[in-house]
Amino acid sequence: MIRPRTALAAVGLAVLAAALWWRKNPSACPYGQRFWVEAPHPFITRDRLADVLEPATGERILEIGPGTGYYTLHLADAVGREGALEIFDIQQQMLDHTMRRVGEHGLSNVTPTRGDATSLPHPDDSFDAVVLVTVLGEIPEREAALAEIKRVLRPGGRLVVGELFGDPHFQAFGSLQRRCAAAGLSFEIRSGPRLGFFARFRA
C-alpha cells in the first residue's frame, strides 16, 4: 500500500518535472488546459491592469494572448464603441472562445486575428497600447516579439506586461526590463510585488 506522503511526493515531483520541461520548451497554454487561464489571478487583477494601462475611450489596443478573455471584456469596455480592441493569438480555439464571450456581452469593437507574435500582420504605428499577461514567456523568440511590438506601437504608445510567479513561463522583472530596454521600450511604472506585477513601458 502506498503511503499518502509517498503519493503526495510523487505527484509533487511530477508537477515540478512538468513545469521545468514547460519552462525549457516555451509554448502557449493548450486550449484543453484553459482552466489555468480562467482561474482567479492574484496580484494581476483586472483593476490593477486598468490602473497601469490607463486605457482611454477611442484608443486602439492590441491584446496578445487573450486566453479565454479574462481581461478582454474589460479592455473592450474601457475603449468604448469609438475605440477598437484586437485580440491576437496563435490558437484559433482561444480566439473562438473569447469571441463567443464578446458576443454574449454585446460588444462590437473586438476583432480576432490568428498569428505569430514574432511577425505581427499590422502596419507600423498601429496601436496606442499593447497588452500581454503571462504570455511573453510562452514565446520562444521573445526579443523578436518585443521588436514587433515596438514597431506596431505609435510613438509614445504603451506596452503593459503582466507576470505571475508560479506560471512556468514567469518572466522576472529584472529580465523583463532588460529585454524591453534592448527593444527600445522605456520602463515607466510597476504595480504589484515582484511575485505578481504589471509593468508599463513606453515606445
Predicted regions and their residues:
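Core SAM-dependent methyltransferase catalytic element
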Residues: 192-203
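A short glycine-rich, Lys/Arg-flanked "PGG" loop and its adjoining helix->strand segment in the class I
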Residues: 76, 143-158
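A short SAM/SAH-binding and catalytic strip from SAM-dependent methyltransferases
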Residues: 128-141
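Class I SAM-dependent methyltransferase SAM/SAH-binding core
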Residues: 62-119
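Conserved alpha-helix/loop element of class I SAM-dependent methyltransferases that forms part
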Residues: 40-57
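Hydrophobic alpha-helical topogenic segments used for membrane insertion/localization
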Residues: 2-21
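Conserved class I S-adenosyl-L-methionine
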Residues: 160-183
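A short acidic, Gly/Pro-enriched loop at the edge of an enzyme's catalytic core
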Residues: 118-130
